[in-house]
């Protein structure tokens, strides 16, 4: 009899010991009984016969984790302080299909690859000679053509490639564009793909018919057996960060894989039998291990500082762009209405943006548009109506609601909410002849709806699109002459040290939707005109100025971690928080910079408390995460969300 520790998939349980009459391969999938229910699990390791009686493994499936998946599983569990079973749940959607040995040859001939400019070729060469690189390329500078060329070289080397994109950018048009160069060897992978279609994609992927996957962050967990390239497009995008446990960032996982792939474990017997490691001779580059390329027109401050980058300036668009500023309060001003009317008269189109996450909980001055900052943290404080106070969610400092602006002495206004539905009604009243549609997650619930709406817009059946951050993604609106951006002051005033970075990147992305084929106009409704005028044409200047402001307290110069405690009993949640805090105080080089009730103190019938930590290396945060894990708390390393 053999004995094994089994990782129970998608459960917070520690590995449990089971017996089996035959020898099993590590990380093969099995069915076991937990309580009186059947559960899936992975063989973790063989152990000696335990002193207690244990259940027998019910059966073994044909599924197993690949070397890349095992690397990811163990790293995610360790780095993000997650139970192995919870981390293993990330791979669970791919367990339904059998693992088919990858023995077929990929049929692409790459005869229609795009021709690169001299600068694009330099960027390609730079990227393929570094394990990890960043292409910092202006909108329209030709990043996509570089991606396609890098993918082609990887596939020619007999390897697999993964193109990660924000989910909303993964349109049928994107698939057709990739298939233009790589025939049918492309699989699109995101949450709106039907289960049956996913199973067909997996079958073709595992047989080798598909070697290129274009997908959202979950595609990183597919069973790659010979991955050679990961491209992370729009690497700054928050959608790469998982909001629930384990709180991983797919971009950071892609970077880690590239840096550690050459140190990977010995492949399993099944992987070796597939003979996937054959690499043709006469290649331009060393394709051992995994290479990761990040790309963005507005890269994150952290990536710019830490990753070798190639600056790809210029644009292939033969167009010009004019920026206009509207100082009116949030809403449709006469200026905006008149410009929209002119666009419609010229048979052109417009897009109007409203922020999704403008939580409208920040006090803004009506006269100068500035918000109220914490005197100890240099971040904006949030409005708490019930307490009639402003509060910092970093350190817990609070102050009574002011009666005047600390900057100019003017009156203080509470932000008022305007959503896409209200905005659409206002537009229909002001422009009754216009054909107006909403473009947000409430409206776009399926891939088919997205495809239909984009087609209708590009066919001229819609005059004005009113949307949220979905509008900012890389859709090609060829007849858009005007982009209107509302609500950025609320976005800029978020209680987040990244508020300026996120807001400017968003403004530049939305502005990029206008004037792609001709002259375009961008109207930004803001009281912070000076900020936008300083940086809209030079994001790199903003990054350099922002780095000076952040040193030494914020990333990339320091590391942050947020521990979230939630419990149905508020007293129990508060007590667990105090117990964790007491243990954290013994960790050297760890700073507790804030704790208390979370800004959203009650979600899903559970009370929420937080602890915010800072360190200048990962080790203290890892120790803190292990303490939190023992109490069942969630640790968010490198947090994006402070609610």
Question: Predicted regions span which residues?
Answer:
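Short secondary-structure junctions
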Residues: 373, 431-434, 584-591, 630
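Inter-lobe coupling/hinge segments of SF2-like helicase ATPases
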Residues: 135-155, 159-211, 216-260, 286-572, ...
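Intrinsic-disorder-associated, low-complexity terminal segments enriched in Asp/Asn/His/Tyr and depleted
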Residues: 276, 284-286
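Accessory, non-ATPase domains that flank or precede helicase/AAA+ motor cores in DNA-metabolism machines
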Residues: 1-264, 270, 287-317, 345, ...
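Conserved beta/loop motifs at nucleotide-recognition and modification sites
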Residues: 352, 590, 633
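Short amphipathic beta-strand starts and helix->beta connectors
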Residues: 542-551, 586-599
């Amino acid at each position: 009899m053999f004995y094994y520790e089994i990782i129970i998939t998608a459960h917070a349980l520690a590995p449990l010991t089971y017996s089996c009459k035959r020898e099993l391969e590590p990380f093969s999938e099995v069915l076991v009984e937990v309580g009186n229910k059947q559960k899936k699990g992975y063989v973790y390791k063989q152990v000696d016969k335990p002193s207690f009686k244990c259940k027998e493994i019910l059966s073994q499936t044909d599924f197993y984790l690949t070397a890349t998946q095992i690397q990811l599983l163990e790293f995610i569990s360790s780095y993000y302080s997650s139970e192995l079973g919870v981390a293993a749940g990330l791979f669970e959607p791919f367990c339904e299909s059998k693992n088919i040995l990858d023995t077929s040859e990929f049929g692409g001939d790459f005869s229609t690859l795009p021709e690169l400019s001299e600068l694009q070729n330099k960027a390609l060469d730079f990227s393929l000679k570094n394990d990890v690189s960043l292409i910092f390329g202006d909108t329209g500078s030709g990043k996509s053509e570089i991606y396609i060329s890098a993918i082609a070289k990887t596939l020619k080397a007999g390897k697999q490639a993964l193109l990660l994109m924000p989910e909303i950018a993964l349109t049928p048009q994107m698939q057709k564009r990739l298939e233009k160069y790589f025939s049918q060897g492309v699989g699109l992978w995101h949450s709106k793909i039907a289960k049956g279609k996913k199973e067909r994609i997996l079958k073709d992927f595992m047989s080798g018919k598909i070697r290129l996957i274009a997908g959202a962050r979950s595609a990183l967990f597919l069973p790659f057996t010979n991955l050679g390239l990961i491209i992370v497009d729009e690497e700054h995008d928050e959608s790469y960060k998982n909001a629930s446990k384990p709180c991983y960032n797919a971009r950071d996982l892609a970077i880690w894989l590239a840096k550690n792939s050459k140190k990977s474990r010995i492949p399993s017997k099944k992987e070796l039998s597939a003979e996937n490691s054959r690499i043709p001779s006469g290649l331009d580059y060393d394709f051992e291990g995994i290479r990761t390329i990040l790309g963005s027109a507005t890269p994150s401050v952290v990536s710019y500082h830490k990753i070798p980058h190639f600056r790809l300036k210029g644009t292939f668009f033969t167009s010009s762009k004019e920026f206009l500023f509207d100082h009116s309060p949030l809403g449709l001003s006469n200026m905006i209405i008149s410009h929209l009317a002119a666009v419609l008269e010229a048979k052109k189109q417009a897009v109007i943006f409203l922020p999704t996450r403008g939580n409208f909980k920040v006090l803004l001055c009506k006269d100068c548009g500035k918000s109220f900052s914490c005197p100890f943290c240099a971040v904006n404080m949030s409005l708490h109506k019930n307490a009639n106070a402003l509060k910092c969610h970093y350190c817990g400092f609070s102050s009574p609601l002011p009666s005047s602006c600390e900057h100019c002495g003017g009156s203080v206004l509470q932000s008022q909410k305007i959503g896409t539905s209200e905005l659409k009604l206002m537009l229909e009243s002001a422009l009754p002849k216009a054909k107006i549609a909403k473009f947000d997650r409430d409206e776009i619930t399926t891939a088919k709806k997205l495809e239909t709406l984009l087609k209708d817009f590009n066919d001229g059946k819609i005059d004005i699109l009113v949307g949220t951050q979905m509008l900012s993604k890389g859709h090609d609106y060829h007849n858009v002459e005007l982009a209107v951006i509302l609500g950025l002051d609320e976005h800029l005033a978020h209680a987040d040290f990244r508020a300026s970075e996120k807001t400017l990147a968003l403004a530049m992305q939305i502005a990029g939707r206008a004037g792609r084929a001709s002259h375009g106009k961008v109207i930004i409704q803001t009281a912070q005109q000076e900020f936008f005028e300083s940086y809209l044409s030079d994001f790199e200047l903003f990054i350099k100025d922002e780095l000076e402001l952040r040193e030494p307290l914020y990333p990339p110069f320091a590391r942050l971690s947020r521990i979230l405690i939630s419990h149905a009993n508020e007293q129990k949640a508060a007590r667990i928080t105090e117990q964790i805090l007491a243990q954290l105080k013994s960790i050297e080089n760890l700073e507790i910079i804030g704790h208390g009730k979370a800004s959203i103190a009650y979600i899903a019938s559970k009370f929420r408390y937080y602890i915010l930590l800072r360190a200048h290396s990962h080790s203290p945060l890892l120790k803190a995460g292990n303490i939190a894990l023992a109490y069942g708390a969630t640790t968010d390393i490198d947090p994006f969300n402070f609610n």
